């Protein structure tokens, strides 16, 4: 049997948002590897072995998947959202680079998925309609000073921003520091979108002006989107539409 490895994104939660390409790869898999809650999204079937693991063993998980693929198994590594956005694709290639030479000859495919920032943005309109950046606010794998620097520079450049992993029980104070950086740098009422558990039954959307945003509005299941100085709200009876215009006037202070 010829083995191989697919690194796939399961999207934000709704099964309807899993791509046909990913669905086909899962149907052919002999082994599924991933963080426990993501593996739990895969229905068991005959001939399929599930390998759930903790969220702090990404490199070990990648190495295990590569070892099985080298043995001829059809392995799928699952991530939520897109596998190349703060997810397992980078960990797999890190393992390939530092591992045995024969891993470099394996068939390895990265199959994209719908990442949380795009699902969240779609719920309210087009807040990422112009230049934007995505920042992971977890300091598990990078120093906090770097996070603050990137947030400050993005705010000063007037990017729209998407924040992954804004707050957790282990990191209760970091998001408060981010909000302070934003308020100091922006000093305006640009909208902040808190999109929790998008595309699941627990979905909740909240939009507030930046000065009114508070840390307790976010948790690990929340995607936070911050608009630019040009981002607009269109009022309506339900949640307003939010969009960032695609053009920037010549006299915008950034000449």
Regions picked out by a protein language model, each given a short descriptive name:
Residues 56-61, 116, 140-142, 199-202:
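A short acidic, often aromatic-flanked loop/helix-cap motif at beta-alpha or helix-coil junctions
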Residues 16, 59, 86, 141-144, ...:
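Loop/helix-junction capping segments adjacent to catalytic residues or to phosphate/diphosphate-binding pockets
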Residues 1-111, 214, 250-254:
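Class I S-adenosyl-L-methionine
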Residues 1-2, 24-25, 68-70, 77, ...:
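Solvent-exposed alpha-helices and their adjacent loops that cap or buttress functional pockets
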Residues 3, 85-157:
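Class I SAM-dependent methyltransferase SAM-binding "motif I" and its flanking Rossmann-like core
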Residues 5-7, 74, 156-255:
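A contiguous loop/helix-start segment that scaffolds small-molecule binding in enzyme catalytic cores
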């Amino acid at each position: 049997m010829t083995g191989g490895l697919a690194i796939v994104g399961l999207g934000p939660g709704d099964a309807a948002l899993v791509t046909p390409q990913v669905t086909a790869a899962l149907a052919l898999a002999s082994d599924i590897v991933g963080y426990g809650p993501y593996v739990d999204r895969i229905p068991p079937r005959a001939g399929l072995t599930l390998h759930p693991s903790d969220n702090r063993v990404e490199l070990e998980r990648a190495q295990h998947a590569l070892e099985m693929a080298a043995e001829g198994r059809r392995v799928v590594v699952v991530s939520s959202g897109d596998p190349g956005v703060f997810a397992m694709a980078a960990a797999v290639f890190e393992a390939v680079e530092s591992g045995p030479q024969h891993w470099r000859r394996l068939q390895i495919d990265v199959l994209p998925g719908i990442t949380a920032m795009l699902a969240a943005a779609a719920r309210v309109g087009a807040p990422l309609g112009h230049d934007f950046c995505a920042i992971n606010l977890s300091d598990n794998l990078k120093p906090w000073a770097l996070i603050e620097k990137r947030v400050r520079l993005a705010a000063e450049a007037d990017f729209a921003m998407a924040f992954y992993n804004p707050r957790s029980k282990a990191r209760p104070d970091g998001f408060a520091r981010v909000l302070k950086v934003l308020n100091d740098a922006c000093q305006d009422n640009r909208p902040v979108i808190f999109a929790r558990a998008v595309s699941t039954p627990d979905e909740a959307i909240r939009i507030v002006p930046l000065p009114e945003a508070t840390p307790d509005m976010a948790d690990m299941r929340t995607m936070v989107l911050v608009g630019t100085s040009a981002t607009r709200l269109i009022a309506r009876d339900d949640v307003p539409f939010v969009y960032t215009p695609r053009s920037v006037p010549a006299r915008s202070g950034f000449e």
